[in-house]
Amino acid sequence: MENLSERFNALQDQLMNIYEAAEQTLQAQIKHWQTLRKEPVLLYYAREKGVTRLGYQPVPVKAVSETKAKEAIAMVLQLESLQTSDFAHEPWTLVDTSIETFRSAPEGHFKKGPLPVEVIYDNDPDNANLYTMWTYVYYMDADDKWHKARSGVNHIGIYYLQGTFKNYYVLFADDAKRYGTTGEWEVKVNKETVFAPVTSSTPPGSPGGQADTNTTPATPTTSTTAVDSTSRQLTTSKQPQQTETRGRRYGRRPSSKSRRSQTQQRRSRSRHRSRSRSRSRSKSQTHTTRSTTRSRSTSLTKTRALTSRSRSRGRSPTTCRRGGGRSPRRRSRSPSTSSSCTTQRSQRARAESSTTRGARGSRGSRGGSRGGRGRRRGRSSSSSSPAHKRSRGGSAKLRGVSPGEVGGSLRSVSSKHTGRLGRLLEEARDPPVIIVKGAANTLKNVRNRAKIKYMGLFRSFSTTWSWVAGDGTERLGRPRMLISFSSYTQRRDFDEAVRYPKGVDKAYGNLDSL
């Protein structure tokens, strides 16, 4: 107990000496954080041994000491990495290397030279908010190389430059929705207006594609700068398009004219083929019915002609001719004659009934009906049964998706009458993705953890990658990683199950192909 108190007091003395010396070297700041790391380690050990107080200092719970020790270790690693860069010999104060400064926006970067930026919303001086713009921002790229960038402010927000890319860490439009009602704000730096009241706008989404001419450097001039009328008109005219873009941010991408024309041609061809098939089927049915009717009417006519011919020769209606010149009386007395006549009468009745049915069926087919008696008589030439037609249509609807059709659908997939498999195949034509942005090691940890804990909730992961400037090889922004899915339902389940680490941003999208 006494030994722990003595060690704790010794650490307090070392910290007081560092604060009094106030050295502005990077080595002194590393020593400061190494001393701060020892303090929570000592308190953690004391709590583990059941000690609740060291002198006048209460011992916190182990979780608090563990968190502070980890923060100190992380700051030591960051400062030691900065010491190997070209900026190690610059003056560094306790404020520049504090955990509060390191965590302020932009988070995870060392910063110097704070400048106040005042933004007035709705032209109301009482409705104002203060922001901090840093003169210099020190950031590390994906290759663990440190860079020094200047900050600036425009009507969109506060940013720092990564090559030619403006990385915004404060957006005024977000707070305009929170604090204002008209969506207008005025930007002041050091109590001087640098941007007159402007309306809501958003920064362009493509890296390096922000062509804002109205920008202010970190150190403002004494002259008052305002947005000219031309740029203000451009901002106002672009506002509906930008609003529409934000509305479609997580939807499907707008289709090009060529893709739209190709889709319309495919649809018109499919409609033409379906119409031609239906016409050919109706023609074949009508032709078959008519030919059947003609044959039956011809047979009936021949039968009636034979009957009338026999009557004209003086035979009774019930007699029939079996051949030769035998007399009718002899034939009528023979037992085979009656059966033959009966057979002939039954054939004649069947012919008449079939002719009547054929005529009705032909009338039904001419009237547009595909069912009823006419359909039963023309089964060989008519279309298949409804059950067979449903199965055949279902197989055509649930066929596989070829590589050329992936991403070809420009419509939202309907959930009606397709089934689970049909919906998956339809959504395969426009596979959904999630793009995550953050530190490279953090994204790799997300990928490895998802492969262990969330297997089956995604399709595949990409490696970490970055945008590259168009006029050089410098990497722009934070590293990215793509996560692909088989369907929008799978993406939703993945997004609900996964908890992204702090500092990782996500966005939804879809691709024509993977």
From Swiss-Prot:
Gene3D superfamilies: 3.30.70.330, E2 (early) protein, N terminal domain, subdomain 1, Papillomavirus E2 early protein domain. Keywords: Activator, DNA replication, DNA-binding, Early protein, Host nucleus, Isopeptide bond, Phosphoprotein, Repressor, Transcription, Transcription regulation, Ubl conjugation. Pfam families: PPV_E2_C, PPV_E2_N. It is found in: Host nucleus. One of its GO terms (biological process) is viral DNA genome replication. There is a cross-link at residue 437 (Glycyl lysine isopeptide (Lys-Gly) (interchain with G-Cter in SUMO)). Residues 232-244 have a biased composition (Polar residues). Residues 430-514 are annotated as: DNA-binding domain. Residues 199-231, 285-321, 334-346 have a biased composition (Low complexity). One of its GO terms (cellular component) is host cell nucleus. Phosphorylated. Sumoylation plays a regulatory role in E2 transcriptional activity. Residues 197-424 are annotated as: Disordered. The keyword Transcription applies. GO terms for molecular function: DNA binding; DNA-binding transcription factor activity; nucleotide binding. Residues 248-284, 323-333 have a biased composition (Basic residues). Signal peptide: none annotated. Binds DNA as homodimer. Interacts with protein E1; this interaction greatly increases E1 DNA-binding activity. Interacts with protein L1; this interaction enhances E2-dependent replication and transcription activation. Interacts with protein L2; this interaction inhibits E2 transcriptional activity but not DNA replication function E2. Interacts with protein E7; this interaction inhibits E7 oncogenic activity. Interacts with host TAF1; this interaction modulates E2-dependent transcriptional regulation. Interacts with host BRD4; this interaction mediates E2 transcriptional activation function. This is Regulatory protein E2. It comes from Human papillomavirus 5. The gene is E2.
